[in-house]
Amino acid sequence: MYVHRPDARIFYQVTGNGTRDLFLLPQCQVVTYSRMWKHQIPYLSRYFRVITMDPRGNGRSDRPPTGYDLQTRYDDLVAVLDEVARPPIALVAFSCAAPLAFRYAVAHPDRLSRLVLLSGQYAESVPQPFEERVARVIRDDFDNWRTRLFKRIFPEPHSLKGIEDCVTWAGETTPEVLIESLRAIDGINVYDLLGRVGVPTLALHGTDDKIVPYSHAEKMVAAIPGAKLVTFERGGHGLFGREAVKVNRFIRDFALGQEVPDTRIAATTERAVPSPAPPSAPRRAPRDSQRRVLWLSSPIGLGHIQRDLAIARRLREQNPDVVVDFLAGDPADRVVRHWGERVHPATRLLQNETAHFEGWAADHELHAFNALWDMDEIMTANFMTLADVVERDRYDLWIGDEGWDLDYFLHENPELKRAPYAFLTDFIGLLPMREDRTSTEFIRCWEKNAENVDHLRRHPDVRDLSILVGDEEDVLDREFGPDLPNMRQWAREHFRFSGYTFHFDPRALPERAALRAQLGYRSDERVILASVGGTRVGRGLLRKCAEAFTLIAGQIPESRLVLVGGPRLTEMEAAWGPRVEVRDYVPDLFAHHAAADLAIVQGGLTTTMELAALRTPFLYFPLRHHFEQQMHVARRLDRLGAGIRLDFEHTSPEALGAAMLEYLGKPVHSAPVTLDGTDRAARLIAGLL
């Protein structure tokens, strides 16, 4: 939506249906726009009708050559508020947008209910002489100027993602527009307005803010009648990103009318897990002595939720009083319901991680690390959902199966921990696809690995239990990166090893002939089963399997190809060829794998380990650029001598057809897979109850 000003269109957006309006105002300088609020909008829009705008000069607003003075910017703001706001509103102003907020608060006190100043300021100045020290540098070195600026805005360790985002957003304007915007606001000072601000005001500011010094904030707050100051020890200017959880909650509480006193927030490295739980923690009513578990399960692939359901059932067998609520997005929530288990109502509020990963996917290709790297706003939104759940109700245990959001934000905010916490994963270490230390992916992997190592070093009591779903030897024997620990040695120090977990017992399956009859396969036919998990990335592999099968079908007349698309791959082509069957989601796929004469799969851990345990011959195609499938899973399968690895790009339908013929029904001689991992994982978790 746009407001049309005499010289520019100003973009605004409304999110949420709350009864109260909340306006998030980015800074005046055009180095950012409304995207800077990506960690705030999804959460706050559950409570408010959230309004944002892109200031002239960046984002989806126009970029006129002039009009960047304070008065014109103020007129832009008023025009948007007049167009869309429902007074009285709560106004959140970041950085140099604060002078606009002060002007509006003084001119229209009846239209504001609350004012929040995030790293706010009342005056602005730029280095002089302007042309030499500012304009020329921006024109001649725009890229490096942006990088230097945002390194100052995010001085905290492990801030690379925030720096990268802001450098990108600043690059969406032009050097000339940026120069003009800086020139136009140089020398502004609205200190004389502060004493006339009558709206309840809250300031959030970091002591290490290198853009607006903390002393500036103290003077500003002292001049505003009744204003309160929340101090972030060692916090920088970019609190909206680095302290998103706390910023979100302070904004929520204050805008809803709660009083927030002057508060000092400890630096991240100094924060601690509360022990014992504070009296203010929510207390649940007695429920026949039930012990309640909140289980956050990654929906990226179905392996996580399948093993989690199996472990949960085994946990209840050992502890009948345990009740488990699952927080798991699509398609994992469908599996939970199919098993007849409890899906927490807040699941509907989760942002869809699977859809995000599919957005990074191409034909049999998934840049898994890049998808994880770019999932930060989803992680924030989903952690805020979980934080609200445990704020309202008490659980006796939290479990996160590759719940990267829960794990990251608990280490950043350990004081929010209210129950024992167990972390599960089936791999350790993020890996770049090529060992080029200058590449962006290598640097990002190092950053995230270093952050994870630092988290566990600084806050060893956040996790009460870390389980690797596998064995010590499954961890790669290599460093996380330069100057970082060896992965396997680090895992020995921080993890317990459950062995691989299965959601079924291969030993309990019927004899093969009976199983085939039960599943509708004739005893005299040869069954090739191709399955691609729970996402749409596998369409290309299914298509290639169908093409290969048509080439060899005449050589094996008593044969059938079954293509399993998964719950998110439903629009499969109808006519693949003779003796080709297409199926949607198959809940007990493992039974079909056990009955098959050959399986063809991607390189996902769950499916390949099931096939190894079932001793079914299989061909596997790791997704291109998927570090976990290409390296971590391949390590396990190599150790077992299981499966035949093929490369999707270099395997033609003819070559795949030849492999089908060679391995169809071929005896398997891989090492045996231990089958007690589910029991071991359940026993380890039970120790926390």
Segments (PLM) and residue ranges:
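Conserved HGGG/HGGXW glycine-rich cap/lid loop of the alpha/beta-hydrolase fold
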Residues: 6-60
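Active-site loop/oxyanion-hole signature of alpha/beta-hydrolase fold enzymes
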Residues: 36-38, 42, 52-92, 249
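Flexible "cap/lid" loop of the alpha/beta hydrolase fold
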Residues: 99-107, 112-141, 620
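Conserved alpha/beta-hydrolase catalytic His-Asp/Glu region
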Residues: 125-128, 140-195
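Short beta-strand/loop motif that positions the catalytic acidic residue
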Residues: 197, 203-205, 209
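Conserved nucleotide-sugar phosphate-binding/catalytic loop shared by glycosyltransferases and other
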Residues: 318, 322-373
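A nucleotide-sugar donor-handling region in carbohydrate enzymes
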Residues: 432-435, 440-536, 566-568
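Donor-nucleotide binding loops and adjacent catalytic segments primarily
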Residues: 499-598, 649
